[in-house]
Amino acid sequence: MAEVANNEQQEPQFNIQRVYTKDISFETPNSPAVFQKEWNPEVKLDLDTRSAKLADNVFEVVLSLTVTAKNGEETAFLCEVQQAGIFAINGLTEQQLAHSLGAYCPNILFPYARETVGSLVGRGTFPQLNLAPVNFDALFAQYVNQRQEGAEEAAQTEEASA
């Protein structure tokens, strides 16, 4: 019986406690003039994630999206959304936890953020905006590689100065 209890404690657990919109901003700095011009936008998406420990095994993950649409040289709209979630995560190694917070949780939050951006753009009376899916696993792997390269460079610099 004690063996079963130990196995249950080591079993990874992942629960979504809450998904919510933390911050929203939508600006059309050049309206109404922007509506009078031919619509040929250049859309740029910037995204960022951050996480914070709220309690033992409870984390907040925030996915920030900034979408800028320029029509020629003028900004047509600027949309910023911070989509957040509170996640209870237990039984993972440090590396697995980092991956969950940096890739898995943002992957859960992205559809909510994408829907919010699309809704705001529509309310601004701009044509429908469909954001392409994001490969958060690849972005997280790139982030880990950059950190490792930075640590190696710092170690080499330290050795050279010693």
From Swiss-Prot:
One of its GO terms (biological process) is protein tetramerization. InterPro entries: SecB, SecB-like_sf. Its main location: cytoplasm. Pfam families: SecB (PF02556). Signal peptide: none annotated. One of its GO terms (molecular function) is unfolded protein binding. One of its GO terms (cellular component) is cytoplasm. Keywords: Chaperone, Cytoplasm, Protein transport, Translocation, Transport. Belongs to the SecB family. Homotetramer, a dimer of dimers. One homotetramer interacts with 1 SecA dimer. One of the proteins required for the normal export of preproteins out of the cell cytoplasm. It is a molecular chaperone that binds to a subset of precursor proteins, maintaining them in a translocation-competent state. It also specifically binds to its receptor SecA. This is Protein-export protein SecB. It comes from Shewanella sediminis (strain HAW-EB3). The gene is secB.
